[in-house]
Regions:
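Structural signature of FAD isoalloxazine-binding scaffolds in flavoprotein oxidoreductases
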Residues: 61, 146-165, 181, 318-327
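N-terminal non-catalytic cap/leader segment that marks the start of a structured domain
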Residues: 5, 12, 29-152, 321-323
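Catalytic-pocket segment enriched in acidic/His residues
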Residues: 36, 170, 217-337
Length: 337
């Protein structure tokens, strides 16, 4: 591990007192799985964002394809949210369920899009905050010769980093050369959270999605701060689906995988997280407010390129195809150009 990385980790550990996390329930394997309680919050629905010309529109995954909510709303003269921002933290569950029932009972095929042909946007389109967690898997910490953190290591990305399913990251336009993958479980907040307990933390979650914290390692190591290597345009692909929290019984026990050009590079389980979802939400909310639509990248498992011996480190390049998968959340694909 290089000097700047050691400096960053040491600083992160010294900045906060060692007793900042409660002893009980701080590990992923012993955490509660409470469910959201937002009034009229959608339940049992799997959302996507699709592009319609210059617009981003809400879609619902069904056995017949993706229901184009905006088109269905117009056809049935209904009033329902037509963008994911209008759903997260604002409700609309009953209206969406009613619209979905009408669409499924209809013989109209034009209400549904073939997922294989749909143009996906990020499944969350306008988060106020994109919070990321470093070294949050035990085996990932080991492969990078880093100590297991005693409190979460946080950094951030920006909205310009958002990308969607089948999106493209233009690495050939970047000054960096050492590009790496990081498949991650992403938490999407559904209620405002400030100083919430671990016990109540998951009741503030809207849903979960698959993400990849795409990273430029050479820029990450420029200084003790990781931002340059983490905030590249398009470096936060998420999706294709946003699955409501009621459909995820335990986010701390999900299979997680990343493939590069069809080759499995990462294969693990979120049970290896050092700090599980309730701990992360509670910890973050002690220091700043999490709002509906904010997203949390929860860390990556072992298998990243930077964890290989130096003589085996073959960095990602233009033309590579990446596939990230979380159990029950869908398969996120993107490519490099």
């Amino acid at each position: 591990m290089n000097r700047s990385r050691r400096t960053f980790l040491a600083g992160a550990g010294a900045a906060l007192s060692s007793g900042v996390l409660a002893a009980s329930g701080s590990r992923a394997t012993a955490e509660t799985t409470a469910r959201p309680a937002t009034n009229d919050a959608p339940r049992g629905l799997t959302f996507a964002t699709i592009r319609r010309g210059q617009e981003l529109s809400l879609a619902i995954k069904t056995e017949r394809g993706l229901l184009d909510v905006r088109t269905a709303e117009s056809v049935f003269h209904a009033k329902a949210p037509t963008a994911i921002d209008e759903v997260i933290g604002r409700g609309g569950g009953a209206a969406l369920q009613a619209l979905l029932a009408k669409a499924l009972a209809s013989a109209r095929k034009d209400l549904f899009l073939d997922e294989a042909k749909a143009d996906f946007g990020p499944c969350v389109t306008n988060p106020e905050k994109i919070v990321c967690v470093g070294l949050n898997y035990r085996k990932h910490a080991a492969e990078t010769n880093s100590a297991v953190p005693t409190q979460p290591i946080l950094f951030n990305k920006y909205n310009t980093a958002l990308n969607g399913h089948r999106g493209i990251i233009k690495v050939s336009e970047e000054a960096a050369k050492q590009f790496d993958y990081e498949v991650e479980l992403v938490i999407v907040m559904g209620r405002t959270a400030r100083n919430v307990s671990e016990k109540d933390a998951l009741s503030h979650v809207f849903g979960y999605c698959t993400g990849n914290d795409f990273t430029a390692r050479d820029l990450q190591r420029v200084s003790s701060q990781w931002m340059l290597g983490k905030a590249l345009d398009g470096s936060a692909p998420i999706g294709p689906y946003l699955v409501t929290a009621d459909q995820v019984p335990d986010p701390n026990r999900l299979k997680i995988e990343c493939r590069v050009n069809g080759e499995v590079r990462q294969s693990s389980n979120t049970a290896d997280m050092v700090f599980g979802c309730p701990s992360l939400i509670s910890y973050i909310s002690r220091y700043f407010t999490l709002k509906p639509g904010d997203i949390i990248f929860t860390g990556t498992p072992e298998g990243v390129i930077s964890g290989y011996p130096k003589d085996r480190q073959v960095w990602l390049k233009a033309g590579d195809q990446l596939t990230s998968t979380l159990e029950g959340l869908g398969e996120l694909r993107f490519s490099l150009s």
